[in-house]
Amino acid sequence: MLLRIQLPTFKTGSYLVQSNYLHHQPTRPLVYFDHWAMMLFGGDSGLRRRFADSLRRTGGTLCLSTTHTGELCRVDDARHARDFDALLAEVMPRAFWIDTRRLLSERDRWTEYPPGDIHAAAEVMRSRRGDFGFYESVWTYGRRPRPGKSTLAEVFDTATLSTAQAVDLARQGEDFRRKAKTFQPKNGRAPAWVLLGELLRSTVLNDAQAFTANDSADMQHALSLLHCDYVLLDGGWTARAEGARKRLLEAGIRLGNVYSKRANGIDRFLADMETPASAAAK
């Protein structure tokens, strides 16, 4: 359903946003794409239309996050941003911005729907006909050098690298590794932290398994499994999620269906989206 929400004028980034309304509330099934999937569907008009048609038929919503924009700013090719914009234009207004940072807050109560990122949504509404699309605008701004300030690409690189280094440092501690081996997912902590603990167990217990800055970004995308019905992730993270599913379910945490390019994943995802009985995966 469409929802009209009164908003004040506020400043986000370098833009003054004067927006009276946000116009979308998420409705299931909720779908989330990793960067590669945004590119795949955005760059293929047939896949793009087929997916958008299935969203409209089921009343579903494509969920987006600041992780998408951070990763986007790291690439040199504007084609990535244009493919993102093509997908967004095809599905609008069936899009919703997730605030993944709030998912990691211990203070937040568990809710059926993910918290929204009102700033990102208002930024989309800044675009007018004839402007760059939202993602190309962010890509251009995010790579532009600013006197005395880091670019958005540099900020994202620093954050993902520091997360990777923190994981690598933590798993060198014997006590930490021992706790990871005996860890049991349970209620009482923010579900996002429980999910991350499960997804990272193999990395902590296996010294030979690298954990890079790219893995840090993939891990942020994987948080969408908590709320979304259909999630397309990198193959390695899809395997991690499936490996954690049973243990998390025993703790009362149900994950969405997850797909990758492997094992005919794109066709299986679209078939599930187009089957009414599969529309309520969560």
Question: Could you describe each region identified by the protein language model?
Answer:
Residues 72, 216-228:
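Acidic, metal-associated active-site segment
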Residues 227, 235-261:
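Accessory, usually C-terminal, subdomains that scaffold auxiliary metal cofactors
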Residues 263, 267, 281-282:
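Pol beta-like nucleotidyltransferase catalytic core
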Residues 34, 218, 234:
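Acidic active-site catalytic centers that drive phospho-/nucleotidyl reactions
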Residues 256, 271, 279-281:
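Acidic, proline/glycine-rich low-complexity IDRs
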Residues 2-66, 70-214, 239-251, 267-277:
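Short, well-structured N-terminal submotif of metal-dependent ribonuclease cores
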